[in-house]
From Swiss-Prot:
Protein name (record): Olfactory receptor 6S1
Role according to the record: Odorant receptor.
Naturally occurring in which organism (per UniProt): Homo sapiens (Human)
Highest taxon listed in the record's lineage: Eukaryota
Gene: OR6S1
CDD domains: 7tmA_OR6C-like
Pfam families, alphabetized: 7tm_4
Keyword flag Disulfide bond: yes
Cellular localization per UniProt: Cell membrane
Protein family (similarity comment): Belongs to the G-protein coupled receptor 1 family.
All ranges on the Extracellular side of the membrane: 1-29, 81-99, 169-207, 264-274
Membrane association type: Multi-pass membrane protein
Disulfide bonds: C99-C182
Record topology, Cytoplasmic segments: 51-59, 121-147, 229-242, 296-331
MF terms (GO), sorted A to Z: G protein-coupled receptor activity; olfactory receptor activity
Length: 331
């Protein structure tokens, strides 16, 4: 018996509510979200591949961009495959272990992404404001350590809240999580105990990660603006700003939706609104990232064109070789 008088149990599974207002269009939703997921994977895998393959992109900015694409691939893969399977299933269940795992990786990868976005902002500041010292400050070893710190910085702080949620007493088997994945707020509402302290802890951790990384980003771009405005030529100012525009678009989308969802003590707001904002964070932003960076960056576009030329040339070469070998075999 829980402190508030409700019977608690050790759950073996939950039910994900999904998108109940759109249940009549499950097949259409499956098709749309599958297409979005495949485009997301394709775009981000291309970014990772071209950054590793093209020597022109062996710079700190593109190294961090490759890490960002890896995070986007993992973040969407934590949520979308289960969501797609539920669209085609009558039972929208998820095991307790899978739910807690999804909870952990969603927040771990999200926190790492915030930290990485802040690092990318600081990297742009150093490149624009300290160009002579930049190669020394952002050497390959430094970039590797900073990227590793971003991954570990997301991995460790989320462990405590995840264990705390896993140990909570829940009121009944098969309780409905009012979301399409195991998010913090909907899970805590199913507990048979007072979760106020845990909610406050989640709020503090989310605020620390989001606000601190946002502060680094804001300060970096504030200093960049001051430095760029001091450049006498208009073409010089435009070139300096062009290197930051893509990152600013991504930062605006990501921070705006995350602050709305998690930097609120009570995690209030209508369920439909929270779902809509989560869709932007989980589906739209990762989908747009490769296109934002690729379409606005001449170096990435040229590298992608070269990679496609090599792939096409390789495929045609293999086809011609197979044809020649088959003709010789016939003769």
């Amino acid at each position: 018996m829980s402190p508030d008088g409700n019977h608690s149990s050790d759950p073996t599974e939950f039910v994900l509510a999904g998108l109940p207002n759109l249940n009549s269009a499950r097949v259409e939703l499956f098709s749309v979200f599958l297409l979005v997921y495949l485009l997301n994977l394709t775009g981000n895998v291309l970014i990772v591949g071209v950054v590793r393959a093209d020597t022109r992109l062996q710079t700190p900015m593109y190294f961090f961009l490759g890490n960002l694409s890896c995070l986007e691939i993992l973040l969407t893969s934590v949520i979308i495959p289960k969501m797609l399977s539920n669209f085609l299933s009558r039972q929208h269940t998820i095991s307790f272990a899978a739910c807690i795992t999804q909870f952990y990786f969603y927040f771990f990868l999200g926190a790492s992404e915030f930290l990485l976005l802040a690092v990318m902002s600081a990297d742009r500041y150093l490149a624009i404001c300290h160009p002579l010292r930049y190669p020394l400050l952002m050497s390959g070893a430094v970039c590797f350590r900073v990227a590793l710190a971003c991954w570990v910085g997301g991995l460790v702080p989320v462990l405590g809240p995840t264990v705390a949620v896993a140990l909570l007493p829940f009121c009944k088997q098969g309780a409905v999580v009012q979301h399409f994945f195991c998010d913090s707020g909907p899970l805590l509402r199913l507990a048979c105990t007072n979760t106020k302290k845990l909610e406050e802890t989640d709020f503090v951790l989310a605020s620390l990660v989001i606000v601190s990384s946002l502060l680094i980003t804001a300060v970096s771009y504030g200093l960049i603006v001051l430095a760029v405005l001091s450049i006498p030529s208009a073409s010089g100012r435009q070139k300096a700003f062009s290197t930051c525009t893509s990152h600013l678009i991504v930062v605006t989308l990501f921070y705006g939706s995350a602050i709305f969802l998690y930097v609120r003590p009570s995690q209030s707001g209508s369920v439909d609104t929270n779902w809509a904002v989560t869709v932007i964070t989980t589906f739209v932003t990762p989908l747009l990232n490769p296109f934002i960076y690729a379409l606005r960056n001449e170096q990435v576009k040229e590298a992608l064109k070269d990679m496609f030329r090599k792939v096409v040339a390789g495929v045609l070469g293999n086809l011609l070789l197979d044809k020649c070998l088959s003709e010789k075999a016939v003769k």
